[in-house]
From Swiss-Prot:
Annotated Gene Ontology cellular component terms: cell cortex; cytoplasm; cytosol; endoplasmic reticulum; endoplasmic reticulum membrane; epidermal lamellar body; extracellular region; intracellular membrane-bounded organelle
Gene encoding the protein: SPINK5
Positions bearing the site annotation: Reactive bond: Q46, D47
Organism field: Homo sapiens
Protein known as: Serine protease inhibitor Kazal-type 5
Protein's GO biological process: cell differentiation; epidermal cell differentiation; epithelial cell differentiation; extracellular matrix organization; hair cell differentiation; negative regulation of angiogenesis; negative regulation of antibacterial peptide production; negative regulation of immune response
Domain notes: Contains at least one active inhibitory domain for trypsin (domain 6).
Keyword vocabulary terms for this entry: Cleavage on pair of basic residues, Disulfide bond, Hypotrichosis, Ichthyosis, Protease inhibitor, Repeat, Secreted, Serine protease inhibitor, Signal
Known role: Serine protease inhibitor, probably important for the anti-inflammatory and/or antimicrobial protection of mucous epithelia. Contribute to the integrity and protective barrier function of the skin by regulating the activity of defense-activating and desquamation-involved proteases. Inhibits KLK5, it's major target, in a pH-dependent manner. Inhibits KLK7, KLK14 CASP14, and trypsin.
Secretion signal, residue range per the UniProt entry: 1-22
Organ and tissue specificity: Highly expressed in the thymus and stratum corneum. Also found in the oral mucosa, parathyroid gland, Bartholin's glands, tonsils, and vaginal epithelium. Very low levels are detected in lung, kidney, and prostate.
Entry-linked Pfam families: Kazal_1
Length: 1064
């Protein structure tokens, strides 16, 4: 029997030795490819030049074999790490509390004073096992021993967020928007505890990912450069200049393997030096701080006993070494002595190094009593708070909830095993998906496969169930195409990374070296650089197209805004979706690209287009509302007085408004509140419309109905309300905590109004009461104006008019008074005596603030908060003299600014004239003919014109009308105006042109008689009226040189009448 066992064991041993030897050989063979591993995968080059030589083919074959070996090895290492990590997190040791003594009377544990740190399953560190047993007895909890020694992750963030860890998925935690502000460990204020923990979990996931990537990279670098480690001296490696290019893990090309390793060692050496410098700096800072604290606390050293120091409550704040603020020096020293005492205990515990190993509890045994209560794969649990750590390393609310998760994990494992076995069976019995779909590959047209609706369910490669084999193959082909396109993009990016730095304005300059390469688009290129140039060009074109699309969208937006502004004046005339327009011919291009007869018809088309867009949008909104109603039908019957009461169950749901709510009930509550607000808003609008048509404002009835139940509870003008949170919005849009607080504010306002009315009646005169009521707003006046809110609180003024609120009633009165007061002051200043007085005052002000003028920086004066009240020259009290001078300087600056603005506004602006100078030469027969080009322009009169030419035509027309009005005025008035204004256009003799009639838009109406006159410009005019007309139209200043025709020596040019003469 023994001989038989030996004969069986020998072949097994030989097999194992051969496997180990082959593994070592594989590692040595694939050693050079380990540095190119990324995320457990190896990508081999697919360049065509490798296939042209025998060495290249051997290299690719070697890479392909190493790819399989290294990827398999990476998977096994990953699995081993996962298995090694699992028992650490999921194997808490047993806690036996029978070994410790209990008190005879109270039954509490009597614990020794030694320090043997133990980490509990709740994540906290306890001094020893006895202390943990005492805590269990005190709180009635069942905390076990997670591990010996201090907890590695006992930082406050994880302890605070332990309740949320079971709900984390891939580092993300879904939270509600509950408003319960919490200050996080990073010093930021978060909306609630869940939001704070979600941010912390995200940071943890990012840090873990970063650490894993750096660890993998470092291991690969270490294995790659193992042969050069002994040659490194002080972080430097000396290499030859042998040309054997190697790509490093950072994507850069190096001269050879040694050069790459030299850079890696240099970087590692610099990082280690910086770390040691940081650690030395921190240690020096700690010792320095400790030395200072020892000096400060030396006086209290003798008073401390066993690390305890008794202090008074004297308030003299000081910051301790831990960064916290302490009440006084004694309390800071007390904290320091306690910390020192704890450190001593820990050091003694480490020196003793006593450890006990406990046995892990079996979760299957712990959850055996709950297994009978499982129904349809679910276990119904209470919300009892008894934290326990589960097999997944997370802390659960109680044993029942932990067992529920344990059963779910068991079910998932069973399903996975069944799936694996089913897949094995399918792989044995059925062909692969490629073979299955090979017959459908020929039937594809333009990348699509047309299938029937035959019902023959089959599971596809994506794990989904498809109606039949054809539809499954269509999904399979689409998946293949996506994977192929993605691989091409990634390959192109990786191949062309070395050329990306050489790109300038989307172009890459290449040599004409002939080394054909196939690009990701399937075309052949002259060399690798030319292929990358085409890739970069395509990228640049895509970016350009995106920019053009964005530009088009922005241009359409600007055009739409211009059309809306242009059509705003016509919007009031729309009736039943139609706009009545004239047939005036003034062509303009609309937003739809069509040419319309005039602006009015264009606006009509624009309004119709808007109405159609609204009609299209309405069904979507209606469908959305109906969907909301259907989802919330089950909760509608639970409404009580328009309110819905919900539990705090955590089952996040996204509502129709895009917000995430705690559960479905909370979402429906928000929907009902929105419906109520819309209903109230409509009712208020109807009431306002009714009040506008009626003689008196009818807003009181609704408020009385709303607050009828609270009106009876009002006693002595006061109403007491609870703090119930049920937000309500009143008619003026103001939010209140609940309906009671809203009604309280309304009823108090009504009571104040009644008191004011009774007071005004008792006084007898409305004017006096008006003065009293508006006194509170006098202090709010700025530069003679009062700014009011739009609060709806109707008040009847002393003149009998109804105003929106008290402020608007007083605004007219106070602004009128301020204007009258300013007018009087201006009249007084015009007198010489007043001027001298004001000059003396300003001199006094300057004398007062002379010492502070030199201290101004950029027109500002920086003052301290010294309390030394001073009354300023305008009667206002200031905190000190500097603050008074600051207000004086501000006032002076404002006055200077106003004067500059008045000066600039008083000067006549000839901008419009200057802009239209280019069009003056094109005026023919007193008219300017403009093209129909659509280029909207904003004129100086605030109107929009089709283009610049139309704007200038309007400017010339207004100028002609102004000149015509000047001509119609009496001679003495016109002469005085011409003397005063240097820019006058006509300086003709008033007696010459006054007898002729002027028509607007036409000019002078001249007779047909022939009385030639010679102008000083050398031209002959039919009569003096024609000379006046030419001066008006051409804006010249021609005088009569002589009667009769001009001499033959001068170039006579008898002007034809630019307008039809009259029949007179």
């Amino acid at each position: 029997m023994k001989i038989a066992t030996v004969s069986v064991l020998l072949p097994l041993a030989l097999c194992l030795i051969q496997d180990a030897a082959s593994k070592n050989e594989d590692q040595e063979m694939c050693h050079e490819f380990q540095a190119f591993m990324k995320n457990g995968k190896l990508f081999c080059p697919q360049d065509k030049k490798f296939f042209q030589s025998l060495d290249g083919i051997m290299f690719i074959n070697k890479c392909a074999t190493c790819k399989m070996i290294l990827e398999k090895e990476a998977k096994s290492q990953k699995r081993a790490r996962h298995l090694a990590r699992a028992p650490k997190a999921t194997a808490p040791t047993e806690l036996n509390c029978d070994d410790f003594k209990k008190g005879e009377r109270d039954g509490d544990f009597i614990c020794p004073d030694y320090y043997e740190a133990v980490c509990g399953t709740d994540g906290k560190t306890y001094d020893n096992r006895c202390a943990l047993c005492a805590e269990n007895a005190k709180t009635g909890s069942q905390i076990g021993v997670k591990s010996e020694g201090e907890c590695k992750s006992s930082n406050p963030e994880q302890d605070v967020c332990s309740a949320f860890r079971p709900f984390v998925r891939d580092g993300r935690l879904g939270c509600t928007r509950e408003n319960d502000p919490v200050l996080g460990p990073d010093g930021k204020t978060h909306g609630n505890k869940c939001a704070m923990c979600a941010e912390l979990f995200l940071k943890e996931a990012e840090n873990a990912k970063r650490e894993g990537e750096t660890r993998i990279r470092r291991n690969a670098e270490k294995d790659f450069c193992k042969e050069y480690e002994k040659q490194v001296r002080n972080g430097r490696l000396f290499c030859t200049r042998e040309s054997d290019p190697v790509r490093g893990p950072d994507g850069r090309m190096h001269g050879n393997k040694c050069a790459l390793c030299a850079e890696i060692f240099k970087q590692r050496f610099s990082e280690e030096n910086s770390k040691t410098d940081q650690n030395l700096g921190k240690a020096e800072e700690k010792t320095k701080v400790k030395r200072e604290i020892v000096k400060l606390c030396s006086q209290y050293q003798n008073q401390a006993k066993n690390g305890i120091l008794f202090c008074t409550r004297e308030n003299d704040p000081i910051r301790g070494p831990d960064g916290k603020m302490h009440g006084n020096l004694c309390s800071m020293c007390q904290a320091y002595f306690q910390a020192e005492n704890e450190e001593k205990k820990k050091a003694e515990a480490r020196a003793r190094n006593k450890r006990e190993s406990g046995k892990a509890t079996s979760y299957a045994e712990l959850c055996s009593e709950y297994r009978k209560l499982v129904r349809n794969g679910k276990l119904a649990c209470t919300r009892e708070n008894d934290p326990i750590q589960g097999p997944d390393g997370k802390v659960h609310g109680n044993t029942c909830s932990m067992c529920e998760v344990f059963f779910q994990a068991e079910e998932e494992e069973k399903k996975k095993k069944e799936g694996k076995s089913r897949n094995k069976r399918q792989s044995k019995s059925t062909a692969s998906f490629e073979e299955l779909c090979s017959e459908y590959r020929k039937s594809r047209k333009n990348g699509r496969l047309f299938c029937t609706r035959e019902n023959d369910p089959i599971q596809g490669p994506d794990g989904k169930m498809h109606g039949n084999t054809c539809s499954m193959c269509e999904a399979f082909f689409q998946q293949e195409e996506r994977a192929r396109a993605k691989a091409k993009r990634e390959a192109a990016k990786e191949i062309c990374s070395e050329f990306r730095d050489q790109v300038r304005n989307g172009t890459l300059i290449c040599t004409r070296e002939h080394n054909p390469v196939r690009g990701p688009d399937g075309k052949m290129h002259g060399n690798k650089c030319a292929m990358c140039a085409s890739v970069f060009k395509l990228e640049e074109e895509e970016k350009k197209n995106d920019k053009e699309e964005k530009g088009k969208v922005e241009a359409e937006k600007v055009k739409r805004e211009a059309v809306q502004e242009l059509c705003s004046e016509y919007r009031h005339y729309v009736r039943n979706g139609r706009l009545p327009c004239t047939r005036e011919n003034d062509p303009i291009e609309g937003l739809d690209g069509k040419i319309h007869g005039n602006t009015c018809s264009m606006c009509e088309a624009f309004f119709q287009q808007e109405a159609k867009e609204k009609e299209r949008a309405e069904p979507r909104a209606k469908v959305k509302r109906e969907a909301e109603k259907e989802t919330c039908d089950e909760f509608r019957r639970l409404l009580q007085n328009g309110k819905l009461f919900c539990t705090r169950e955590n089952d996040p749901v996204r509502g129709p408004d895009g917000k995430t709510h705690g559960n479905k009930c909370a979402m429906c509550k928000a929907v009902f509140q929105k419906e109520n607000e819309e209903r109230k808003r409509k009712e208020e609008e109807d009431q306002r419309n009714a009040a506008g048509h009626g003689s008196s404002g009818g807003g009181g009835g609704n408020t009385q109905d709303e607050c009828a139940e609270y009106r009876e509870q009002m006693k002595n003008g006061r109403l007491s309300c609870t703090r119930e949170s049920d937000p309500v919005r009143d008619a003026d849009g103001k939010s209140y905590n609940n309906q009671c607080t809203m009604c309280k504010a309304k009823l108090e306002r009504e009571a104040e109004r009644k008191n004011e009315y009774s007071r005004s009646r008792s006084n007898g005169t409305g004017s006096e009461s008006g003065k009293d009521t508006c006194d509170e707003f006098r202090s709010q006046m700025k530069n003679g104006k009062l700014i009011c809110t739009r609060e709806s609180d109707p008040v009847r003024g002393p003149d009998g008019k109804t105003h929106g609120n008290k402020c608007t009633m007083c605004k007219e009165k106070l602004e009128r008074e301020a204007a009258e007061k300013k007018k009087k002051e201006d009249e007084d200043r015009s007198n010489t005596g007043e001027r001298s007085n004001t000059g003396e005052r300003s001199n006094d002000k300057e004398d007062l603030c002379r010492e502070f003028r030199s201290m101004q920086r950029n027109g500002k004066l920086i003052c301290t908060r010294e309390n030394n009240p001073v009354r300023g020259p305008y009667g206002k009290m200031h905190i000190n003299k500097c603050a008074m001078c600051q207000s004086i300087f501000d006032r002076e600056a404002n006055e200077r600014k106003k004067k500059d603005e008045e000066k600039s506004s008083s000067k006549p602006s000839n901008n419009a004239k200057d802009e239209c100078s280019e069009f003056r030469n094109y005026i023919r027969n007193n008219e300017l003919i403009c093209p129909r080009e659509n280029d909207p322009v904003h004129g100086a009169d605030g109107k929009f014109y089709t283009n610049k030419c139309y704007m200038c035509r309007a400017v010339f027309l207004t100028e002609a009308l102004e000149r015509a009005k000047l001509q119609e005025k009496p001679s003495h008035v016109r002469a005085s105006q011409e003397e005063d204004s240097p820019d006058s256009f006509s300086s003709l003799d008033s007696e010459m042109c006054k007898d002729y009639r002027v028509l607007p838009r036409i000019g002078y109406l001249c007779p047909k008689d022939l009385k030639p006159v010679c102008g000083d410009d050398g031209q002959t005019y039919n009569n003096p009226c024609m000379l006046c007309h030419e001066n008006l139209i051409r804006q010249t200043n021609t005088h009569i040189r002589s009667t009769g025709k001009c001499e033959e020596s001068s170039t006579p040019g008898t002007t034809a009448a630019s307008m039809p003469p009259s029949d007179e």
